[in-house]
A protein has these predicted regions:
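Outer-membrane beta-barrel porins/channels
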Residues: 1-278
Length: 278
């Protein structure tokens, strides 16, 4: 639900409560159990659901050919993933990070609209995402602990309050889009999105599980009116391949030992939808 208030002919504000739902499952992470504060709750426990709540506010202003908007959304406070309390920091807590942003749209011609916006995602507000992964020495110590059965050698066990995470930082997201209403039947759209990789190269190891390395993606699509009351929309998205790699070098008692981790990804997505007006 949304509550909106029109201040005057040009300015409006709105408020929405946000209800969150997450579902998670993990398989094949048995090797991570040796690094966990709760080894039985790391992997192969089926689906786990979490619910939560937050809030969002927004502003929209229209001034001739220009429209401007701004929004802010609180953290969405989620239930813990109790079945995976030994995987995510704070006993399975995995809140949705807060975000804020602003944008502008320009009606360049009667048919062409150009829009741009920027937003900030505050990953640092969620420990499961922002906690750093192990250094080389911490990993070698934990591996030694797993071999000899000494969990005290694991500096920040998975699932603990300071448990190892993905090391994500806050990021800025930039978007540019165009909308061209060719005629009453056809509308064409295109867009570009850029956001830096949210983690440093030395966090590549644990991000094998969540390789968010894509920085740029483009979209193109159209809407075709079939009848006065129905339409079909098609969108294609391509995310350009990006790579992150790092070689971890041990020091002190682990001098001479090393290992490497590499993350890479590209994406293709095609979406088709059909709409009806009642």
């Amino acid at each position: 639900p949304t509550i909106a208030y029109k201040i005057n002919a040009h300015n409006s504000i709105g408020f929405s409560p946000v209800i969150g739902y997450q579902s998670f499952r993990a398989y094949g992470l048995g090797l991570f159990q040796a690094f966990s504060s709760d080894p039985s709750k790391v992997t192969n426990n089926g689906n786990d659901d979490a619910y939560g709540f937050g809030a969002q506010i927004g502003y929209l202003g229209t001034f001739g050919r220009f429209s401007v908007g701004a929004m802010a959304r609180s953290k969405i406070y989620m239930d813990e993933f109790s079945k995976y309390a030994g995987l995510f920091a704070e006993q399975g807590d995995f809140d949705v990070p807060p975000t804020f942003g602003a944008g502008i749209a320009v009606q360049a011609t009667s048919k062409l609209t150009i829009a741009a916006d920027v937003s900030r995602i505050l990953y640092s507000q969620v420990d499961a995402i922002s906690n750093k992964g192990p250094t080389a020495n911490e990993f070698f110590s934990a591996f030694t602990g797993a071999l000899v059965g000494d969990p005290s050698l694991v500096s920040n066990p998975l699932g603990s309050n300071n448990g190892w995470g993905f090391g994500w930082d806050d990021v800025w997201v930039y978007k540019l889009g165009v909308n061209y209403a060719y005629n009453s039947d056809w509308t064409f759209r295109a867009g570009f999105n850029y956001a830096q990789v949210p983690y440093d190269d030395d966090q590549a190891l644990f991000n094998v599980l969540a390789p968010a390395v894509v920085e740029k993606h483009v979209t193109a699509g159209f809407t075709r009116s079939l009848t006065p009351n129905s339409e079909i929309t098609m969108t294609y998205m391509y995310a350009f391949r990006n790579d992150v790699s790092y070689t971890y070098q041990g020091t002190g008692p682990y001098t001479g030992f090393s290992y490497s981790a590499k993350n890479n990804m590209y994406q293709n997505a095609l979406e088709v939808s059909y709409g009806m007006k009642f």
